[in-house]
Amino acid sequence: WSEVICKFYALPDGEVIGRAYIRKSGKFSALPVFWEAAATGCEISVDEETGKISMEKLATVGDVGLAINPALAEGQDIGAATMGMGIGLFEELIYEGSQLVNGSILDYRLPRFSDLPRHVELHLVQNQDGVGPYGAKGGGEASLNAMAANIANAVDQAVGVRIRKAP
């Protein structure tokens, strides 16, 4: 069954979503961008005695073409930024020999509500240039991608220490 499912749901060149596709002729001769592009930034503070990093401000901008459901699109972006914050600050698989010691939700460190910044700015760019309905693009979770690098750069700017690896 796996081959049948993969073949049915695969996205060959020109296919946008589901079973529809864009013909490569006329104004659609080049496959258009269908996914969300995003930019993120953050400000952090570092406790010089403990080394604890706290995120003070977070900003995200996502180009979604058109947010058919703006609350959902905003939730996707802020949730993705929070996941990226976890990657940049907390998440780490810890082993003793070959045994994973933090393999449960009780032991694996994820962001808590208390870790979230007090100031969040979220913007959706909606210029209706997507190939989806009414100019929508495939929005969701693009703000995840750069968060760990944002945190590393903010730490370098704050205390002059370059982080080159996520926890």
Show the residue positions of the predicted features.
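Cofactor-binding beta-sheet edge motifs in enzyme active sites
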Residues: 1-167
